[in-house]
C-alpha cells in the first residue's frame, strides 16, 4: 500500500541571511506561545524588544555558516528526506518546517489535495519539550481544523531512549572517538526552568535532589532535562566511556530567566580550567547541524575554549543524512502510534 505519507518536521530557518528575513523568522519563532510561554501582551512586548538588535546579530551568525545551497539545517533535512524515501515504503516522504518554509500547513494541504488521509507526523526531536514536539502537534491540529482536512495522524514519539536512536548515534559518533581526546561534552539545547516545572505532574520532582536519573515514568515522560541526561548516560554506557571523561551541559540561553544548568558557555571555561586540552563536543538534541551547532559551538564555542586555555574543540557532526540513521528512523516511524 502506498497511501500513507510520512511528514518529517524540523525547526526551520530564515529564508536567507538578510536581516529582514531573519527578523520575520525570529518573530514567528519567538511569538509561538510554546516557545515563550508568557501572556500574549507580555510576549509581544518582549519579542518586540528582542527584535530591535537580535535580527542583525543573528543574520551575521547565519551568514557565517550559510552554504551555497542554503541553510544547513534545511539542506541537511532535505537530504534526510531523500534518504528516507529509500526506507519508507508506504507512500511519499515530505518535509516541513515548524517556522519558515515549507510550512506544515503548506505540506498538509498539498497531501490532502493529493488524496492522502493517513499521515505519520515525525517531529525530529529526540527529547520531549513543549517548544519542540508539542508545538508541531498543535500546529498540525490547527491546520486540520482550519482546513477541515480528513486525515488520521500517527505521531512519532520522543525517542531519546530508543535502541534505534542510540544505535544510530553510537555508529555515527564512534569514528570521531577513535582519536585521542581529553573529554567529551554532550551539549543539549537549553530550556527555561519554568518549562520543566509546569510539566511535572507531581510538583515534587523537577530539579530536586538530582532527580533526572531516578524520575518516575509519569515525570520522565515530559521532563526534557531528565530525558537529555538519560540519553547521554545511555550513549556513554554503549560507547564504554568512563565516568569523568564525559559531561552534559545546556546551550542557547536566551534572556535573563533561569534556564536549566549547567550552561555550556560556563562549562567550556570550567573544562579548560581543569586542564582539558582537546575537547570533543556533540549535540544530541539536534538531528541536523544548524546555527546552534555550527556557529554557537563550532565557531564561538571553539574560540571561547581556546581563550580559556584549551587547545582544540572539535565539533562532532549531527546524525544529518547518515544512511544508518535513515534506516533506524524509519523503524521508529513504522511503529508510531495513532494519535490524531
From Swiss-Prot:
InterPro entries in the record: Ferrochelatase (IPR001015), Ferrochelatase_C (IPR033644), Ferrochelatase_N (IPR033659)
UniProt-recorded Gene Ontology molecular function terms: ferrochelatase activity; metal ion binding
Pfam family, one: Ferrochelatase
GO cellular component: cytoplasm
Residues at which Fe cation binds: 189, 292
Primary subcellular site in the record, as a coarse category: cytoplasm
Pathways per UniProt: Porphyrin-containing compound metabolism; protoheme biosynthesis; protoheme from protoporphyrin-IX: step 1/1
Keyword terms: Cytoplasm, Heme biosynthesis, Iron, Lyase, Metal-binding, Porphyrin biosynthesis
EC numbers on record: 4.98.1.1
Subcellular location: Cytoplasm
Gene Ontology biological process terms, A to Z: heme biosynthetic process
Reaction(s) catalysed (UniProt annotation): heme b + 2 H(+) = protoporphyrin IX + Fe(2+)
Enzyme class: lyase
The keyword 4Fe-4S is annotated on this UniProt entry: no
NCBIfam families tied to this protein: hemH (TIGR00109)
Family according to the record: Belongs to the ferrochelatase family.
UniProt function note: Catalyzes the ferrous insertion into protoporphyrin IX.
Name this protein carries in UniProt: Ferrochelatase
Amino acid at each position: 500500500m502506498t497511501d500513507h505519507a510520512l511528514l518529517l518536521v524540523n525547526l526551520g530557518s530564515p529564508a536567507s541571511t538578510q536581516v529582514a528575513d531573519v527578523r520575520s523568522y525570529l518573530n514567528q519563532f519567538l511569538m509561538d506561545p510554546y516557545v515563550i510561554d508568557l501572556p500574549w501582551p507580555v510576549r509581544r512586548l518582549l519579542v518586540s524588544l528582542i527584535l530591535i538588535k537580535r535580527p542583525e546579530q543573528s543574520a551575521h551568525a547565519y551568514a557565517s555558516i550559510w552554504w551555497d545551497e542554503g541553510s544547513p539545517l534545511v539542506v541537511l533535512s532535505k537530504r534526510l528526506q531523500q534518504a528516507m524515501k529509500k526506507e519508507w515504503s508506504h507512500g511519499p516522504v515530505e518535509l516541513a518546517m515548524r517556522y519558515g518554509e515549507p510550512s506544515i500547513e503548506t505540506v498538509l494541504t498539498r497531501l490532502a489535495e493529493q488524496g492522502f488521509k493517513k499521515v505519520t507526523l515525525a517531529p525530529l526531536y529526540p527529547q520531549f519539550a513543549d517548544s519542540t514536539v508539542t508545538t508541531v502537534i498543535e500546529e498540525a491540529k490547527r491546520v486540520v481544523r482550519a482546513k477541515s482536512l480528513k486525515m488520521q495522524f500517527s505521531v512519532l514519539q520522543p525517542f531519546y531512549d530508543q535502541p534505534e536512536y542510540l544505535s544510530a548515534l553510537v555508529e555515527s559518533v564512534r569514528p570521531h572517538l577513535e582519536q585521542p581526546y581529553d573529554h567529551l561534552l554532550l551539549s543539549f539545547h537549553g530550556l527555561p526552568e519554568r518549562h520543566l516545572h509546569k510539566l511535572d505532574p507531581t510538583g515534587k520532582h523537577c530539579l530536586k535532589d538530582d532527580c533526572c536519573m531516578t524520575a518516575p515514568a509519569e515525570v520522565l515522560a515530559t521532563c526534557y532535562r531528565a530525558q537529555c541526561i538519560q540519553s547521554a548516560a545511555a550513549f556513554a554506557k554503549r560507547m564504554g566511556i568512563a565516568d569523568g571523561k564525559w559531561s552534559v551541559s545546556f546551550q542557547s540561553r536566551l534572556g535573563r530567566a533561569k534556564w536549566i544548568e549547567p550552561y555550556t558557555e560556563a562549562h567550556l571555561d570550567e573544562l579548560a580550567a581543569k586542564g582539558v586540552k582537546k575537547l570533543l563536543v556533540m549535540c544530541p538534541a539536534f538531528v541536523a547541524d544548524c546555527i546552534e551547532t555550527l556557529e554557537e559551538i563550532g565557531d564561538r564555542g571553539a574560540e571561547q575554549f581556546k581563550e580559556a586555555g584549551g587547545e582544540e574543540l572539535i565539533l562532532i557532526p549531527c546524525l544529518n543524512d547518515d544512511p544508518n540513521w535513515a534506516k533506524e528512523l524509519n523503524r521508529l516511524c513504522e511503529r508510531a502510534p495513532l494519535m490524531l
